[in-house]
Amino acid sequence: MLQTSIKKIHGKLKGSNLNTAEVIVNSFKRAEQVLELNSFISMNNNAGLQVESSNEYFKNGKPRSLLEGIPIAVKDNFCVKDTLTTCGSKMLQNFRPKYTATVVQKLLDSGAILVGKTNMDEFAMGSGTTTSIFGPTKNIWGSRFSNLCIQEKNDWFIPGGSSGGSAVAVASGICLGALGSDTGGSCRNPASYCGIVGLKPTYGLLSRYGLIPLVNSMDVPAIMALNVEDTACLLGIMMGRDENDSTTVSKNLNLALNYSSSSVKGLKIGIPAEYNCQGLSDEIRSAWNDIAKVLYQGGASIVPVSMPHTKYSIVCYSILNQCEVASNMARYDGIEFGLRSKEKGNRKNSYVTTRYSGFNEVVRSRIIAGNFFLLSSNSNKYYEKALKVRRLIADDFNNAWRKGINILLTPTTLTDAPKYSEYIKKDEREQSAIQDYCTQPANMAGCPAISIPIELSKKGFPISLQLMAPKFEEKTLLGCALYIENAVNFKNMNEQ
């Protein structure tokens, strides 16, 4: 039931061919069936109340939006009032916020029904959804729930991260849409590995209020769905100015797309040479070339472009990430909220033991590195220099836009989903340099980017590509993505 579009389910609900209770029961049953994938940290025990409310709107013939009665999932770093919001960390394992994140509230006010909170890397620091205190999430592709089970005992394929729980929830048919967050690719990476659509909107288009921060200058609420149309629907509901987030802008983007006859005629598509990098698989390189041909045949012009500072981007991103992490993590001191050590003695000892026991090694290492970069003797060598390089990276994008480029076409990830046993051979810092190579520049520049599935690899796993566009050009971005989606006709998990 939930491997179709929001519009189709809404039509059945509106036409009384289906009721909200059936949809949500189906969602929870599916979650139970694939429980071992560990995509959720907690389920919403109050979903029944939302179902009753939604049914009333349908009975009165006044559904609030296309999302009325539609099941959604939310990554566990978005606050939901009086609901466990853990960030996958021991530090917040009992934290229940007193307010709801703006983007979540907009979804709920539009009639969407929250199924649960999804698993994630601890504090969103990771690219595999392998570091949560609730255990790792497993990719449905290659599992016993897929048509091609090649998962070995005590091993599996990672879903990507850090929003892997949301990606698996959508890919496995538990919900029709999910919220993730994207700081350096945390939505697009798992979307790529799980064969779904993942959108990182322009920085400032969606409110960050209620999103527990990782890197304030790059964090963006992100959208995961089965198709481009559903992605646009979710974006349209959540975007807009929020007085609780000073970085948001008043932009009412027209996202109306012609879903039956999308076109790329006249678009100028840039192919950045620097993304043809070491480690890029031949299969993804081939898919990249094939889609460039598809766009050319559709009337777009294909233009080679250079983004010369891309090679510095991952190092620059790493430094800025760790500096902001060190600042943001300082609030978890065991005094105001979160875990508090039972260590007796002075406040300093309590502070140290709280943070040591509350954070995993990945988080602690980023805090230490960030504080090192921010030392007065080091700040100008690392932090300030990284800020300057970030400006040069943003200028690379701006130069492309000034030359008339409408869309940049690149890989999302360098390979298809790796096995867990292979992934953990490198630590998270090394993996970040690999997994985020193609995705984090868009966060550095603040521009929108989308990952869309293209085809299956030889081993039967999704291969995806990324599109990037100028700030607030989401309509162009989604339109181009829709054209590719229609051209490749990628089949989701249950359609394979």
UniProtKB/Swiss-Prot annotation:
Gene Ontology biological process: glutaminyl-tRNAGln biosynthesis via transamidation; mitochondrial translation
Active site: K75, S162, S186
Enzyme class: ligase
InterPro entries: Amidase (IPR000120), Amidase_dom (IPR023631), AS_sf (IPR036928), GatA (IPR004412)
Gene3D superfamilies per UniProt: Amidase signature (AS) domain
Keyword RNA-binding carried by entry: no
Places the protein is found: Mitochondrion
GO molecular function, one term: glutaminyl-tRNA synthase (glutamine-hydrolyzing) activity
Keyword field contains Membrane: no
Coarse class of the protein's main subcellular location: mitochondrion
Record GO cellular component, one term: mitochondrion
Enzyme Commission code: 6.3.5.7
Keyword annotations of the record: ATP-binding, Ligase, Mitochondrion, Nucleotide-binding, Protein biosynthesis
Reactions performed catalytically: L-glutamyl-tRNA(Gln) + L-glutamine + ATP + H2O = L-glutaminyl-tRNA(Gln) + L-glutamate + ADP + phosphate + H(+)
Subunit structure: Subunit of the heterotrimeric GatCAB amidotransferase (AdT) complex, composed of A, B and C subunits.
HAMAP family linked to this entry: GatA
Similarity section: Belongs to the amidase family. GatA subfamily.
General function of this protein: Allows the formation of correctly charged Gln-tRNA(Gln) through the transamidation of misacylated Glu-tRNA(Gln) in the mitochondria. The reaction takes place in the presence of glutamine and ATP through an activated gamma-phospho-Glu-tRNA(Gln).
Name of the protein in its database record: Glutamyl-tRNA(Gln) amidotransferase subunit A, mitochondrial
Source species: Pediculus humanus subsp. corporis (Body louse)
